Amino acid sequence: MASVVLALRTRTAVTSLLSPTPATALAVRYASKKSGGSSKNLGGKSSGRRQGIKKMEGHYVHAGNIIATQRHFRWHPGAHVGVGKNKCLYALEEGIVRYTKEVYVPHPRNTEAVDLITRLPKGAVLYKTFVHVVPAKPEGTFKLVAML
């Protein structure tokens, strides 16, 4: 009995392999062309932002004059210089503009600067450019002291 069942199974397996496959089972692919994309090279033709130094070393500035515009701190504020919302530097008093290179000591709460300092080799010093305005008129002198 078992041999008859085994013979029937093998016979059906062989006939299913040798029988022709139906036409619906065959997949036929024809050549096709995908439609072109609609991307364009937009932008890249805009003019520059005109950032940089507006007042050079030795120029006379009035209070409120913009000294430099910048995206990131390339120049740092010094004496009598303020910082705008967009990191532009402006004069707080009228006087003459001076640029100096000074040792940069970051605030301890500034984590990015502290991480940079700790990655430097021992004994290395960071120098940054600072912008100062030297006031034109001397700061208050006491007349009573001059009268003595």
UniProtKB/Swiss-Prot annotation:
GO terms for molecular function: RNA binding; structural constituent of ribosome. InterPro entries: Ribosomal_bL27. Its main location: mitochondrion. Gene3D superfamilies: 2.40.50.100. The keyword Oxidoreductase does not apply. Residues 1-30 form a transit peptide. It is found in: Mitochondrion. The keyword Hydrolase does not apply. Keywords: Mitochondrion, Ribonucleoprotein, Ribosomal protein, Transit peptide. One of its GO terms (cellular component) is mitochondrial inner membrane. One of its GO terms (biological process) is translation. Belongs to the bacterial ribosomal protein bL27 family. Component of the mitochondrial large ribosomal subunit (mt-LSU). Mature mammalian 55S mitochondrial ribosomes consist of a small (28S) and a large (39S) subunit. The 28S small subunit contains a 12S ribosomal RNA (12S mt-rRNA) and 30 different proteins. The 39S large subunit contains a 16S rRNA (16S mt-rRNA), a copy of mitochondrial valine transfer RNA (mt-tRNA(Val)), which plays an integral structural role, and 52 different proteins. This is Large ribosomal subunit protein bL27m. It comes from Homo sapiens (Human).
